[in-house]
Amino acid sequence: MGASARLLRAVIMGAPGSGKGTVSSRITTHFELKHLSSGDLLRDNMLRGTEIGVLAKAFIDQGKLIPDDVMTRLALHELKNLTQYSWLLDGFPRTLPQAEALDRAYQIDTVINLNVPFEVIKQRLTARWIHPASGRVYNIEFNPPKTVGIDDLTGEPLIQREDDKPETVIKRLKAYEDQTKPVLEYYQKKGVLETFSGTETNKIWPYVYAFLQTKVPQRSQKASVTP
């Protein structure tokens, strides 16, 4: 597909609720690269009680943000195991010092930025309700429960996570914007930022797919499958 044989070093960025998880999952289904989520990595290290995991947990328990140097150590340590693969970083870098530290270790080829209007994200996130015992997620717009506020299988009440309440969502989006604006500007100046704008993941995805076809080999068993 005209994809270069050189390994791809990519980053995906997008606000909470931008569809970043869905797009990342589709990318790894269709293309030969490893997806590295800093959130998953953090949880794994905390569960295993590694040195970095214990350090990170101490900050989280105090309600503090994990410092840049701890996140950087975590990500770079894991990337050492992926030197033979193309990879897609998700959730790192989040700040300018993290981006600069990553640059000292690897040359980033492309940064995929999902640009979804905040109003759309707000509607998307505040429409989410969960059944706490099972973790089942409902979306009032896309997959509502049969009875408002009630889990389909157990008949138990659904709750809205604190994170999904409108006032919290607005704060999270503002915090994301403030934190990542310098990172996006940094990558823009380097000429590696590719922004994909839209309101629906299914409409953004074909453009991301077409873009990556020029960058990285497709998975052979998926090569004939339409995205």
From Swiss-Prot:
Record-linked InterPro entries: Adenyl_kin_sub, Adenylat/UMP-CMP_kin, Adenylat_kinase_CS, Adenylate_kinase_lid-dom, ADK_active_lid_dom_sf, AK3/Ak4_mitochondrial, P-loop_NTPase
Binding positions for AMP per the UniProt entry: S38, R43, K64, G91, R94, Q98
One Pfam family this sequence matches: ADK_lid
N6-acetyllysine PTM sites in chain numbering: K34, K64, K80, K174, K189, K203
Compartments in which it is found: Mitochondrion matrix
Domain statement: Consists of three domains, a large central CORE domain and two small peripheral domains, NMPbind and LID, which undergo movements during catalysis. The LID domain closes over the site of phosphoryl transfer upon GTP binding. Assembling and dissambling the active center during each catalytic cycle provides an effective means to prevent GTP hydrolysis.
Protein name, entry field: GTP:AMP phosphotransferase AK3, mitochondrial
Organism: Homo sapiens (Human)
Gene: AK3
